[in-house]
A protein has these predicted regions:
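Bacterial Sec-dependent N-terminal signal peptides
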Residues: 1-25
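Stable alpha-helical elements in mature extracytoplasmic
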Residues: 88, 96-97, 101, 163-172, ...
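N-terminal regions that are enriched for targeting/export leaders
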Residues: 25-82
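Second-shell loop/turn segments in exported
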Residues: 78-90, 152-158, 305-313, 322-323, ...
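Active-site signature of cysteine proteases
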Residues: 26, 217-464
Length: 464
């Protein structure tokens, strides 16, 4: 009897513990009375409250002292033509990567304008990512359902976001076609509904693969049947990728230069022809991790038989050196950043002085870049194409930069965004640069073994 009483008392004590903790850590009536004094209801509070009832915070926080447009002159600028538009999709990584190649092709062949088919590469991106997920499920079939990697796979079966490794892997494997050989469709421009159905199907297929008891050969046959269904659905949504096509090349005077039949691979080899897998490196400014080290993100790739995302972490000033060298040589770069921070979309500027949130809210915001990353307050969210820098003649230091965006020509400054150098320091994260612009000491860093980071590391979400 004594034992039963003791157990009952212990259960009562355990049951009361959360309530006790809640009482100590909760907002009491006295605390509420005290903190409510912060709102004084004076003329200043009333004016701000009235304004916030009828207008957005971003509009009211616009800094009147910074309303003048940033000077649009740049000392060095890559020659480009035209602005692309990813519409309502997360394909910025693809547009940025192809825009780097597009600028080179327009300049080299004196084209009036040109776009590669983003839809063509996107078709294979989605097919390859579906295979990546399904094969990942097969590879982890011996792990429990609550294993971190299994949970991550089912939480992230598919995305339309990505990064430059996807561009290099997919273009190398499947080639390229002009935009008119496989034009955009409603589903490529508006990916949400298509992605939702694919993710639902992948999760169902993933469960089937995990519960299957067959041999590896049988599992691979199941996966192939699943991919057959997915290929059909992608074709319904995006169209079927061309096996061959005819392309008429004209110069900037609109004179026909050639008319020729191509395959996607022969078109890529003739007009791009560079080794995307080995000619470029990715550098990153992540102040939370040690500089001078190479990092690899496990399972962060677009193609199962491709390679993981690999980068070297560098101080921002070293990254600027390479960016300036590339721009001066008329070569655009894949660039990614936390684009929404302090962005004036109407003017097309990224400037720390665009908005004065502190005066409006009464808050102070003092976190540095490292602290923002560590607390999930900042991270790379969008990829664009770095095309210009303005260097001060006296100091030799950059004053501002310009990126070609993929939100259409009506967005920002003629389809571009202009950023101050101070904004670059705080919110730039990744740059992909050709090796010929990279100093020897940085190239040597890639000879060391990379530090392997897990796929679920919060710093490495896909760029959209």
């Amino acid at each position: 009897m004594r034992r039963i009483t003791t157990i009952f008392a212990a259960l009562l004590m355990a049951a009361s513990l959360p309530l006790s903790l809640s009482a100590q850590g909760g907002i009491s009536a006295d605390m509420l009375k005290e903190i409510s004094k912060a709102y004084e209801g004076n003329a200043n509070d009333k004016a701000i409250r009235n304004a916030l009832n009828t207008a957005s915070i971003s509009v009211l926080a616009e800094n009147a002292e910074n309303m003048a447009m940033i000077d649009t002159h740049f000392s060095d600028e890559v020659r480009t033509k035209g602005i692309t538009d990813q519409k309502s999709s997360g394909r910025c990584w693809l547009f940025s990567g192809l825009n780097v190649l597009r600028a080179k092709m327009i300049d080299k062949y004196d084209l009036p304008s040109f776009e590669f088919s983003q839809n063509y590469i996107f078709f294979y991106d989605q097919l390859e990512k579906c295979n990546l997920f399904l094969q990942g499920i097969i590879d982890t079939r011996g792990l429990s359902d609550d294993d971190r990697k299994v949970d991550w796979l089912f939480s992230n079966p598919l995305s339309d976001g990505g990064q430059f490794t996807g561009v290099s892997n997919l273009v190398t494997k499947y080639g390229l076609v002009p935009s008119d050989a496989m034009p955009e469709t409603f589903c490529s421009n508006n990916t949400s509904a298509m992605s939702s159905l694919l993710k639902l199907k992948l999760r169902e297929d993933g469960l089937r693969l995990r519960s299957a008891k067959g041999s590896m050969k049988q599992l691979l046959a199941m996966k192939e049947a699943m991919l057959t269904e997915i290929y059909r659905f992608l074709t319904l949504c995006l169209g079927e990728p061309p096996v061959s096509f005819k392309w008429t090349r004209c110069n900037s005077k609109d004179e026909i230069v050639s008319v020729k039949e191509y395959t996607p691979k022969s078109f890529y080899e003739e007009f791009v022809g560079e080794d995307l897998e080995n000619n470029y490196i990715m550098v990153m400014n992540d102040p939370c991790r040690e500089y001078g080290k190479v990092y690899e993100i496990d399972y962060d790739r677009h193609v199962y038989d491709g390679h993981n995302w690999l980068y070297v972490n560098l101080p921002v000033e070293r990254i600027k050196e390479m960016a300036i060298a590339s721009i001066k040589d008329n070569t655009a770069m894949y660039f990614s950043c936390d684009v929404a921070k302090f962005m004036d979309r109407n003017k097309g500027t990224l400037d720390l002085a665009n908005f004065d949130y502190e005066s409006l809210s009464g808050f102070t915001f003092g976190m540095d870049k490292s602290e923002r990353v560590r607390t999930h307050a900042s991270g790379s969210s969008h990829a664009m194409t770095l095309i210009a820098v303005d260097i001060d003649a006296e100091s030799g230091k950059p004053v501002k930069w310009m990126v070609e965006n993929s939100w259409g020509p009506a967005s920002g400054y003629k389809g571009n965004l202009i950023m101050t150098d101070e904004w670059f320091n705080e919110y730039m994260f990744r740059l992909v640069v050709e090796k010929k612009y990279v100093p020897a000491d940085i190239l040597k860093m890639f000879e060391s073994d990379p530090v392997l980071l897990p796929a679920w590391d919060p710093m490495f979400s896909p760029e959209n």
